[in-house]
Amino acid sequence: MAKRKLNRRQRWRIEKIQAEKRDRANRRTDQQEILVADDLGDEQHGVITAHFGQQVEVESADGPGAENRTTRRCHFRATLEQLVVGDKVIWQPPKSEGLGVVVAIEPRDTVLKRPDMYGNLKPVAANVEQMLVVFAPLPTPSSSLLDRYLVAAELSGIAATLVLNKADLIDDTLRPFVDELSDMYRHLGYPVLEVCAHQREGLTPLHEALAGKTSVFVGQSGVGKSSLINGVLPEADLQVGELSSNSGLGQHTTVTARLVHLPTGGQLIDSPGIREFGLWHIGEDDLLHGYRELSELAGYCKFRNCSHRNEPGCALILAAQNGDIDEERLANFYQISDTLNEDGRERYSTDS
């Protein structure tokens, strides 16, 4: 379903209401800080491990080893930018019972964002080192959708690994298609892991990929992200959904973003399922840089302002004709480029 388009007056009205709410929250926060300052301990480092609306869960980062980890529910100052799971913060624990307070955010190494319902950028996870792009035989994988995740990873500076889940569903009919799709991405340098979460088969490569990194699973609903987390971290016991018999799409089962620690080292951020994935505020030049093999070739085009569509001497077209790049990837680039609207925001729904 298309997103609601707002006129200038409606956007001004929404921004005015939001500004008034922020002002009221800031005044309340100033009063609360005066009242509770004496009840808080010394400032210390921490990491946001969960977000619950007006409160967050903070894990203390002071002291080495898992035995020193403690978590505490906290308020956060209204003057802070939006907190997300994975944020490294400065916080003050309560001296007795009660809630702590997050007082500052440390600089982010990376931030993963997506547009909200008004088209504004909204961070969903911070300090992610690796994006695990999950796909499965069902719902039927789309290279165009996979490319969207990979472009997002490239532009965010996050390493990407593709994870083919539900390998037990691959029959003789599906195998050639799945192998061709996987080989296309392996040829580009993206690792592709083939696993089966329900049977715990082939999870060793996934454990190795997760070790020592902060990772996030992405992918359309129904591909088994929660099942994979249960496979590598059984005590997480995340709810698992079935595919809808009507749409063939999965049902969203994760309702709160959360950071969990893995026995082999590293952290995993599980965030609510994303059925619609937009490429935020980008133009065609940015989109081009999200395609690593196309970006390398673009400088060899005959014309500096080449649109890579039908100009003579276009290096991308020549490379596709010569078999040096995959025609499917170039077609996906064209498709995504065509969906970029005039203000640079792309709209795409995996429901379609």
From Swiss-Prot:
One of its GO terms (biological process) is ribosomal small subunit biogenesis. Keywords: Cytoplasm, GTP-binding, Hydrolase, Metal-binding, Nucleotide-binding, Ribosome biogenesis, RNA-binding, rRNA-binding, Zinc. Binds 1 zinc ion per subunit. InterPro entries: G_CP_dom (IPR030378), NA-bd_OB-fold (IPR012340), P-loop_NTPase (IPR027417), Ribosome_biogen_GTPase_RsgA (IPR004881), RsgA_GTPase_dom (IPR010914). One of its GO terms (cellular component) is cytoplasm. Residues 109-277 form the CP-type G domain. One of its GO terms (molecular function) is rRNA binding. Zn(2+) binds at C301, C306, H308, C314. It is found in: Cytoplasm. PROSITE patterns: ENGC_GTPASE, G_CP. Its EC number is 3.6.1.-. GTP binds at N165, K166, A167, D168, G219, Q220, S221, G222, V223, G224, K225, S226, S227. Its cofactor is Zn(2+). Monomer. Associates with 30S ribosomal subunit, binds 16S rRNA. PANTHER family: SMALL RIBOSOMAL SUBUNIT BIOGENESIS GTPASE RSGA, SMALL RIBOSOMAL SUBUNIT BIOGENESIS GTPASE RSGA 1, MITOCHONDRIAL-RELATED. Belongs to the TRAFAC class YlqF/YawG GTPase family. RsgA subfamily. This is Small ribosomal subunit biogenesis GTPase RsgA.
